[in-house]
């Protein structure tokens, strides 16, 4: 599930990766973005992409329906992060994961304002406080951290 899918930049790449037997949920709170994703679904005949117009505090996905949540540069927009994590935990299938990619908390000429950035260490602490442990970390991105969490 691509949380904060926007225009579907990652959604359609993930859909290609999971193939015809997989499914990618494009989750966004913006009706305009969902319309854009729906248009791309039709244009590309992406039968494995399902768009979801979500609530700000609920991705509106069925329990145990998601293998992996993909959250790139949008976590700071989620107002009630504790509630959101609780819901995602229920929505994960056994063995599921949450991928968090976000900007390092330092001054950059792009990305969200400094006060909205979440430090890597704070993200790990927040996830641990909500029942998720760090299972993998990738360091190939120069300006962002790439963390993978699994329920404890």
PLM ranges: what are they?
Residues 1-59:
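Class I SAM-dependent methyltransferase SAM/SAH-binding core
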Residues 15-19, 82-97:
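A short glycine-rich, Lys/Arg-flanked "PGG" loop and its adjoining helix->strand segment in the class I
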Residues 29, 74, 101-104:
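Short strand-turn motif at the edge of the Rossmann-like AdoMet-binding core
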Residues 67-81:
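A short SAM/SAH-binding and catalytic strip from SAM-dependent methyltransferases
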Residues 97-124:
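Conserved class I S-adenosyl-L-methionine
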Residues 130, 135-152:
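Core SAM-dependent methyltransferase catalytic element
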């Amino acid at each position: 599930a691509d949380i904060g899918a926007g225009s579907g930049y990652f959604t359609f790449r993930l859909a290609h990766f999971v193939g015809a037997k997989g499914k990618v949920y494009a989750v966004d709170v913006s009706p305009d973005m969902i319309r854009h994703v729906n248009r791309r679904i039709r244009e590309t005949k992406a039968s494995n992409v399902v768009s979801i117009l979500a609530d700000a505090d609920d991705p509106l996905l069925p329990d145990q329906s998601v293998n992996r949540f993909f959250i790139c540069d949008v976590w700071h927009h989620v107002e009630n992060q504790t509630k959101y994590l609780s819901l995602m935990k229920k929505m994960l299938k056994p063995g599921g994961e949450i991928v968090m990619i976000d900007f390092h908390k330092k001054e950059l000429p792009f990305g969200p304002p400094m006060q909205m950035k979440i430090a890597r260490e704070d993200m790990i602490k927040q996830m641990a406080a909500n029942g998720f442990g760090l299972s993998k970390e990738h360091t190939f991105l120069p300006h962002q951290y790439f963390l993978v969490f699994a329920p404890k």
